[in-house]
Structures are given as C-alpha cells and as structure tokens.
Amino acid sequence: MSDWLGGMRIAPVVIVPLACKGAYLDRYAEPDKGWTDRDEGRWPAPYWHIDTGMATLLILQTAVDEGLGACFFGIPPERIGGFREAFGVPSDHTPIGAITIGHRAQDPGTPGSAARRARRTADEVVHRGRWGGKG
C-alpha cells in the first residue's frame, strides 16, 4: 500500500458530503423563491450536486487554511450500498465522494501521471469574449 493511501486510512476525520435533490427542489418551491412546483426542468444542471460540490471545496479550503491535510476522493459505486447500510443513509441522499482530514504527511512528490503530464496553459482553458478567444 502506498504511503498516501495508508495515511488516508488513518485520517482522524472522514466527511461524506451528501446531496439531496428532494430537499433542494422543496426549498425552491417555497413562496420566497417564486416557484410553486418542484419541476427539475428549471435547472440546467443538477444544482443539488453542484452546491454540495461547492460546500466540499470550502471544507477542503478551510482544512488547508488551518494547516491540515485534506483529500477528496470518490466512493466506488459498488461500495455505496455498504456505506448507506453502515451509516443509515436514506436512499434519497447521494454521496458525491469523501474527504479525509488530518495532519499532513511529508510530501515525497507525486509519482503518478500528474507529475509526468504538463499542465495545460491558460490559453488552453480560459476563453475570453468567445470560445477560442485569446486574451
């Protein structure tokens, strides 16, 4: 087992962010939001997942700001049933991944493909004014 995985297995904190589509649709059907139905068609993307992802990012950022180590990782689909059963998670709540938080280990460098692959340039990922527009 690699050092990083061993460290994640003993992290003192594991957070599993859960998205709940029903809670999201219910909230936006309340009078102060202006809609009275739960029509999913109003959403161009599943914002219940997007908002959960943004909350996850804030958890990661806060952990790092506090000098801790943190890592987001996906939960393999074949393990979600066991996770639900172990923690009594209702079927309408969807885990979007997991976060481990602990004291950061010494970083020996990344041996994986990310270390060998060059980062894309800003011109490759940022478009100004229109797709392909340079800045």
Can you say where each PLM-predicted feature lies in the sequence?
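Glycine-rich, charged/polar anion/phosphate-binding loops
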Residues: 1-2, 83-86, 113
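C-terminal helix-cap and adjacent tail motif
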Residues: 96-135
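Hydrophobic pocket-lining residues that define ligand/cofactor binding sites across diverse proteins
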Residues: 60-63
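GST superfamily/GST-like fold recognition
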Residues: 46-47, 66-82
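Short secondary-structure boundary segments
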Residues: 19, 75, 103
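Short, hinge-like loop/turn segments at secondary-structure boundaries
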Residues: 33-34, 88-91
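Alpha-helical transmembrane segments of helical membrane proteins, especially in multi-pass transport
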Residues: 54-56
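Glycine/small-residue-rich phosphate/adenosyl-binding loop
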Residues: 1-52
